[in-house]
Amino acid sequence: KTILTAALLCAFLGTQAQEYYEKHVAFPAGATTEQKIDMASRLVPTPQQLAWQQMEFTCFLHFGINTFTGREWGDGKEDPAIFNPTELDCEQWVRALKEGGFKMAIITAKHHDGFCLWPTRTTKHSVTSSPWKNGKGDVVQELRKACDKYGLKFGVYLSPWDRNAECYGQGEAYNKFFIEQLTELLTNYGEVHEVWFDGANGEGPNGKKQEYDWDAILKTIRRLQPKAVTAIMGDDVRWVGNEGGLGRTTEWSATALMPN
């Protein structure tokens, strides 16, 4: 009786596993609308996606050299000497977020201007060339420690578009440069819960555009921070569709997948 019960349970679980699709579902050729609706209704999130949805309240902190130029997008020609946030207090930021009910803070570690808020080895267009803390400062580290102190999760935004890097637009050379920056962020700052990329793809200082190696980029994240969700250009969290601050009344989480 015990063996039979166990066998029936295994059979039941096997059936259940076949009925649900995690993260992605690919419709077979010739599937009817009804079949597609049925399959889509059995699409479930990964544990990381579910945990992300349950947080509900994340703060995206836009801070960088543009804070000192008053521009939305920098051109990569900024003098690092203007970056000198002598009164920076990441604990004050995170304490306010905690009191406001936020569950995670994401920092613009590098925006389109290419200026890095951490002491990267990849470029001089960073905090190391600024007067702030005599070039020894690290905004990413200060925010990371503040998040740890107040119990918030931590994420990073890294702009694929770089208007300062000379290798931008040179294919493999820039992809290697970008992945090196990403690797620094994912290995030197403890657990990273979200990695946020947009699809910005303007011209670099050489007038060229870059073809990003998203496959290699996402593999790097999965290898170094397997629990992190990837947002917008990743395959865990998609863009809401506008920058107005509000999504549609009904905003489904399903993402269209184009099979190879």
Language-model-detected regions and their locations in the chain:
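Bacterial Sec-dependent N-terminal signal peptides
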Residues: K1-E19
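Mature catalytic domains of secreted/periplasmic carbohydrate-active enzymes
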Residues: A17-N260
